[in-house]
Structures are given as C-alpha cells and as structure tokens.
Amino acid sequence: MGISRDSIHKRRATGGKQKQWRKKRKYEMGRQPANTKLSSNKTVRRIRVRGGNVKWRALRLDTGNYSWGSEATTRKTRVLDVVYNASNNELVRTKTLVKSAIVQVDAAPFKQWYLSHYGVELGRKKKSASSTKKDGEEGEEAAVAAPEEVKKSNHLLRKIASRQEGRSLDSHIEDQFASGRLLACISSRPGQCGRADGYILEGKELEFYMKKIQKKKGKGAA
C-alpha cells in the first residue's frame, strides 16, 4: 500500500467516501520517519528524492558538531544521552535523536579547548583538608611518573593573559564541566541531513530546560 500524502483516499467533508478515480502518483508518496537512534554503530542511508536530489537518512548516530555560542567555538563530540523532548516523552525513553531534542554531550573536547585558550582547567573538584594530605603523598609519586609540561612562550603567555581579562563563565556551565556532561540542543535534522549537530545550552534557555528536567525527575520519583 505505502504511505500516501494525497487527499483521494480521504472522506469528503460530508462524510461520504470518494471513488478512487486515478492511480497513486510518485510525487504524492510519503516516507516513514527515520527515528534516529543513539548508537555507536553509525548508520546513514542515501535517499534519492524528487528532482534527483539526495537526502541522508541517519538511522543510528552518536557524534555531532556542537557550538559554544558565547565562546564562538565548535567541537566534534559524543552524544551521551537524550534527556528531554518537548513534544514526546517516548522519544526520550527510546533515545531518539530529533531536531530540538535536549541531549547530554561529552564535555572533554570543550574542556581541552578552554585549557589551551584560557589556560584554565575546568571541572576540577575542590579538595577538602583530609583529601589534600592523601593527594600530597600521591602527588609526589605522580610527579615522578608524569611527563614534563610543555613550556609556553612569552608571546603565548601574554596572549592568554589578555584573554583572561574578558573571561566570564556561567556557574551552571561550570557545574556541568565538573560532571563531564554538557546539556545541548540538536539544531540539525538527523533524518534529513544525516547529522546530529547543535549548540550548548546557556543563560535563560539553560535555566529553563534545567527546571523542566528537574520537574520531570520529581514526577518520576513520586
């Protein structure tokens, strides 16, 4: 039978059935949704569409390019989990990647960039007095084993110092770096272009989705 986007198979406004007066047409054809799943076994299909054009139907993905707007940088990173979808909870349960889905991405590539750009290591946990003593003993052993740090040139040090002047970081994002997972939104259409690209959530948008996710967790616990 196939999925048809015509109106010939629909009833009339009065409720009566219409007689099929012509065969189906190729241009009225519909295709089933991609329902791109989160999986390390990347699978993307090439689909020939009207006009001889091509669509890329992603069936399984686990990586994408995510931009950090306030820092004007983009990094390829792993998608770890789907945590929220405004339209459908079923898509969260089945870990389906669609446009505007809220996902958790790996923070490591951004952490690495931040260290090289600002000379600041993000996500380091604050140590208590008891743990510092233990770390002191372990640190001595590690210092012997660890390779020497690459010496930075004076020019690079000046450049990092000038960047430090205008540096500011949202406290919510800093907390996320400590956990190693950043909340992001998918802005591409995986079922159409075969990619799950997006942007890191910040500011008011981040606060909004954090509240939504927290509310959902509260309902689940009840």
UniProtKB/Swiss-Prot annotation:
Q: Name one GO cellular component term.
A: plasmodesma
Q: Which residues form the signal peptide?
A: none
Question: Known InterPro entries for this protein?
Answer: Ribosomal_eS8, Ribosomal_eS8_CS, Ribosomal_protein_eS8_euk, Ribosomal_Se8/biogenesis_NSA2
Q: What is this protein called?
A: Small ribosomal subunit protein eS8z
Q: Name one Pfam family in it.
A: Ribosomal_S8e
- Give a yes or no for keyword Cell membrane in this entry: no
Basic residues: compositionally biased ranges: 8-26
GO MF terms, alphabetically ordered: mRNA binding; structural constituent of ribosome
Recorded coiled-coil stretches: none
| Biological process according to GO | translation
Record NCBIfam families? eS8
Q: Which UniProt keywords apply?
A: Ribonucleoprotein, Ribosomal protein
Stated family: Belongs to the eukaryotic ribosomal protein eS8 family.
Organism name: Arabidopsis thaliana (Mouse-ear cress)
Which residues does the annotated region (Disordered) include? 1-37, 125-147
